């Protein structure tokens, strides 16, 4: 080949290599750089490098371990292969090709088995790399202080160590089986070659294979040991209880121990036979015993016979300790061990509930449904098509010196609602960059428009109650936000004012600098949008704001946290903030009942698994709606998982005491967690063993009824004095009914205010006492002739009767049932009208335009009828 052709070839190859490098850099380097800038802009640059370094360290360490496993074995094998030089073999001999391979393997440690070991180590260990964070948790796992009753191991072993051991075992077993198979083949070929010259395989080769065999046996013995520990996750006794029972601990466990013993014997006598040609019969006996023990362990008939003829006739007494272990573990795993059980003794004299205290409580009753509130907000407070209210939430604020329960929603930007002709790049990314303000109304029935009292309304926000928010701009929220470039030469639309628009320039901390051509190039490639690079509307203070959906924002920062489905808005004098509840969860808590999140339609989205058996609301996250800053606060310091993460990432999670007071005043117990806990407590409140075994006091969620359908009643917030008498607390409340029946069995309460945040109380009714549930009250309402006639009359017109969520409200030792009645126009999107309020004590039913009128009417009826005694 001529010189110029050679140079041309080298140049061409160089260009190809450079192109491939740039392509890889484009796919990997640009996202890495963008992430680095994004994390750094939020003061999480050190945290970003921490995570990157941790991944690199785990990658290197795991790779080194498996590299050494392969490298050392290949290096040892190289000393026993290639005893003949290829030159000593006549050309064309059949074994010539094998000797070439073996000779290169023997003499080429750097060029043959070094890269081979590296490639194999990465392939085998790749699942371990993907679990790099689990490795870190394993290394820093705290002592939980609770022991598993089956084996006496700390619970932290099961949460952190056991899953990693299972994964490591699998990869080690694959590695040594691969080595054993490949080197056995090589040594067998070498032995055949040597035997043609009357030679034998070196003793060292036999010992090498023996060590590999021994390692495989030891790994298998470890596997059996982990299977022994894994019995604590048995679901064989569901639906009665979780964890091991008599069959597992008295039948399966002994066979596991026998299998381990026989496997150890097989390993010993196999090595003895290989090296001494002795012990073959004993080896055969141990092998047969191992097969028998393994078969007996998995022989379903043996398990069935034990269960059917030993356990079943004496199940309660035999399974007693295992059931008790399961009850305790399940209550601990879902943080239900400290639920306070109180008896709810109802008053017999109903007329005693008509007093000033009850009247004050009724003013805070949330008669508006969340879904219907959303319709009202969109109709009355959206004001422009490009605004929207993605969700409304319930909270409490001090208004006129009293704790007032309210609805509030953020007026967020909804760019998709702009006319199609206005959906231009400049409008999308430079002009319409943010939402503005909020609306707040009373949760109870009001006197204003749509039967609501508005505490904050309009654009800009107006308030007769003195609410003043310095920065109402919403650049980060629950909506689907595009990237925005702000500030910019074009200026940003802030809010409409009459026939004009008020403009603004973003002054917040959020966003990544977009002042240089290099930065514009990087982001134009990242977003695949050339207009970022070519726009002339940026200047030295311009920044690009992205990942503005708060859930996406948090998941990018802390993907290991499980997020609640409903972040909620908090308004302070400084600005608007989002509070996002976050959970740590696991499927590895021993003996605890497993909850299928998807099967029960619970709203927390599981990551990687549809099941959990441990959960804690360990962290509350605050996101500034204007600046986009994200702060993490620990609200359950007893959780070992969040303790471990705090050790891995020091400084990331702050103690709850550091949360600003004006934000901390609005924390609340999360509905998602409460619903999950109560789904478990419905069964596991039966701590009496006989009652639990008979399942005679199983609870379930009550149903809510419309005139056309029924769905599960979700928890709702009330402001009552159910924790401490004469002290109003913001509570999460859920009535539970008897499974298979409609009567109410208990009322479950979770505190949201300090010092009772997280306090769980179960108010139970005596078993022999009939307390109506929502279905029975719904039947009582439908049977009332006046109510039924009025419903029929309304439905004959163009209107449609919609029943809101029934509020079951315990006040002054009496149960009141409050049923809002709404009217909507059929096939119309007009504002739903709160037409009537129905109130009942379980026997009498009254329906009036307002709650207070209905309350007065109920009083009148009870006094007229002389109704004293126990309500039904």
From Swiss-Prot:
Record-linked InterPro entries: UPF0182
Pfam families reported in the protein's UniProt record: UPF0182
One Gene Ontology CC term in the entry: plasma membrane
Primary location class: membrane
Top-rank taxon, per record: Bacteria
Keywords annotated in UniProt: Cell membrane, Membrane, Transmembrane, Transmembrane helix
Localization per record: Cell membrane
Membrane-spanning ranges: 8-28, 56-76, 109-129, 159-179, 207-227, 254-274, 282-302
Membrane-topology descriptor: Multi-pass membrane protein
HAMAP family: UPF0182
Family: Belongs to the UPF0182 family.
UniProt protein name: UPF0182 protein Noc_0961
Organism: Nitrosococcus oceani (strain ATCC 19707 / BCRC 17464 / JCM 30415 / NCIMB 11848 / C-107)
